[in-house]
Every structure is written in structure tokens, then in C-alpha cells.
Amino acid sequence: MKKLFIIAIILMVTNRMLAQTGPDYQLHLQLVDESSVFESPDYYTWGGSPIKGNDGLYHLYYSRWEKKYGFMAWVTHSEIAHAVSKSPLGPYVFHDVVFPRRGKQYWDGMNTHNPTVHFFNGKYYLYYTGNTGDDNNVVGQLNFSHRNNQRLGVAVADSPYGPWKRFDKPVIDVSADSTAPDALMMANPSITQMKDGRYLMIYKGVAKKNPGIFGGPVVHLCAIAKSPLGPFKKILKPIFIVKDSPFPAEDPYIWLQGKYYYAIVKDFHGAFTHHGLSLALFYSKNGIDWKPVNNCLLTVPEIHWKNGKVTKLKFLERPQLLIEHGKPTALFLAAHELEDSTNMGKANTFNVHIALK
């Protein structure tokens, strides 16, 4: 009888553990403290990627650009900066600019954006989107010279403080084949080390098939390399797709946990979550074929504070995770305030850091 009881307990615990993986995996967002916000009065702040450094402190790499240029200047005047905190959720304090402009002649010489930081084999790797262009900024308009020159980059350092070694070529460039799904531009890299030791990257690609300067379709693609520095072999099979929805997803963040790969993805219209603009959770057995988890809604664009207030937002996106001891402990997001007649074109942005359970 005692043996049967022990077996029953083991089965119950095992089933509970299994229910938290694969298609049943869940992340639970906790209430947010006011100190878990990072912003600047003079800069748009966007998309923070955290990591615990070898100094015991927490390091945040994020995009910023001066507000005087307008929000759409993310594509012309963004730079990647670095902030530091004693606590994983903050408060973070600005430390330095990681990638200042270095000239039009470089593929990433005019703009760096949307960083994601990782620690592989004793070194820090900072992946990002870079571009060059005509340097012509018109407030409220997207500069397509810069937008369509976006490529994927990586820099490497021995310390979270740098110095960072940048490269004269992208880590992944657009495909030479004009019919390829990433023939026009690429952006927003996300990377994880695979079960076999290789490196899986997922990125946004834009094709040249659609007429007009915007191009399209916009899709997400995989690439795999033996080294964090590449070369990456592309798998030109679109993922996170929905029939009759030309651009359903953006900003995936991927990681390996246990025997599954997971991704947090911005769901533009609720094609996956059925809750409109939201963040959705996906899983994969091999990192290439992806499906939404059961109950895939992670959050809608709003923040629930510890003081009981709820802030509704225009955007809540660019998910990045703090992963410690192999498990996600905090979710970092870029937030854009709602706009109305009083702040049209001038709404604030900030990064918010949310504990996970």
C-alpha cells in the first residue's frame, strides 16, 4: 500500500512537470513595481535586453534616440546604450553608449537598434540591427533609405563593459536571389544555443515580391551556425505564419529550456491569441517548426502595477528575457504610451521589467 502511494505521488509530480512544458508551457507575469521602469526625459527608450555580468551586476542593453527627431527616427538616429543595476528589475542607471555612429561607409555606421545580448563560451555577444542611408530625417516619416538597408550584426566582448569588437560586414546579409524572402532587408535577430551546441537565429526578412518601396511579404526565417559569429546557413522557410495574414507576427525572442524551444512573439492582430494586439507564446521541438502553446496569450498591451493601477498602452513589445540557471526570471518589454490630442506624436516610451513566476 505504501509503495502504491509513493508511485502515485511520483506520477502526480511527473504529470505536473510535464504539463508545464511543450504545448502546455506557461509564463506568469507578476505585478510591477514603479522602480522597474527605465526611461529618459530626452530620449525615446526602447527594447532592453538584460544579462547578469561577471561582476555580479545586471546589465541592460537598449535602443535610444533623441526625442527632438520624433519617434520614427528609430530608423535613422537610434544608438545602442548600456545601463547597470544591482537588482535584476532595476532601477537601472545609464552607463555608456555602446555603438555610436561611425560613418555612412559602414553597413551599420548610421544606426544601431534592437539589441539582444547573450553569453556563450566565456564571451558576451551583442546581436543587433544596423543600417546606413542618406541621413535625411523628417519628423513623423519613416526613412526608407535606412529602413531598406537594415542588416543583422554582432559584436563580441570579454566584459559587459566592453570594449566591443564590431565587424565590417553583417553576420547575416540579404539573399542575393531577388526572389528570396529576405532579398530586400532583415531585422530583429534572436538567438539561442541549440541542443547539439549549434546556434539558432530567427530574424525578420522582407522580400522584393510586393510592389512599392515597402516591399514584402514580411516573414520570419531561421538560420543555423556552428559559431556565434557565423557563418549562418539560412533556412528560407517562413515561420509564425497564418493563412491570409501577410504580416501576423514580429519581434520573436527565442530560448531553449529543457527539451523544447520557446518563443515570445508579438501578435499584431490576434491571429494566434484572438485578443487583438498582444504577445503570444510558441514552442518547437527542433527550433524550426513552431506552434502556439495551448492558451498562448501572454499579455495584452497593458501594465498591472503593485499599487493596483493598470496602464493601457499603444504598444507593449520587443520581448527579452532575463534567464538565470536555465529558466526565465523576468520579462523586459518596450512600452509606448497611448496617444490622444494632447500628446499626438510626442507620447513617451519606456522599458518595463516584469518578474515571472
Task: Locate predicted features.
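Carbohydrate-active catalytic/glycan-binding domains of CAZyme proteins
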Residues: 19-357
